[in-house]
Amino acid sequence: MKKILLSAVLVISLFAQEKNFVEIGAGFINSKDNFSTNELSNISSLASASDENEGVALVDFYYGYQTSDATTVYASMFLGELSLGTNFMTDIGSFDVGITTGLGGKEWQNPFLTNTNRAKTDVSEIGAHVDYGFSLAKAHNVQLIYSYSVKSYDTETVQDSLKRDGSRHIIALENSYTPEFGKGQFTYLFNTSLENYDAKGDASTYDAIMFEFGITADITKNVNLTAIAGLGSKEYDQSNPVFGKTVETDISSLVGVLKWERPFEYKNFYSTLKVGYEEEDANVEFYDKENTFTLLSLGYRF
């Protein structure tokens, strides 16, 4: 399944504290993305992408095994990304170290070709992460995350300055604050992330920044709603030789998660509805992107 939204991953990370669960679901994605292989293989111009619809299946899980009072080893999968790691508690906070890999995907060997069939190529990405969690106050929690990954394309036929093989660095800071006056019924969220993608080609190398604000609140005893809005930007390092300018992009997103605990009084079960929208508005039409997704799933804790 294609990567949907960074926001969605951050929202789902809120529920990763619920150890040992499996969640199965399905949904759809409506998107506009010239770099997606769901788009037409033969395009006549380098203009905005057309709409595409895709049905998706969802299998998320987390399984942790406590090797000591302070250490847990785990395996997890969220939105098609498989992680293996270790979490351990110390006097100064919690640490999480692990490796992450996607299930593989496909992209165009050369997405900029027109009036000819574009060929697909296999793409893989594998990386590692280090997380540090701590608290500055009783009502405040912080998660500092650094992740590094390497992305590889089997075959690329673009110009050298557009080569996309590269390494990705992400630094993220996730904050949550649960005020005492709310009696624990709602929590404010503030997330910041910085991304550097260092590609072989300077015209495919970029820096991105994202700010996200949100709230999670108990609607009823068994129903919780989380909403996160994001704003950000992305800027490439060098002028794109196909378009004769450096690509710059404004990013906006909105993600909502509605969670229903013990539906119809079934113990250990829960149901989740995830909806989201993201837009990348670039100064080059070909780089414009839109994604809208809806996912409905049923989970079980064990």
Region roles according to the model:
Residues 46-49, 113-120, 125-127, 154-166, ...:
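Extracellular loop and loop/strand-boundary signature of outer-membrane beta-barrel proteins
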Residues 65-67, 88-92, 132-136, 175-181, ...:
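Residue-level signature of outer-membrane beta-barrel architecture
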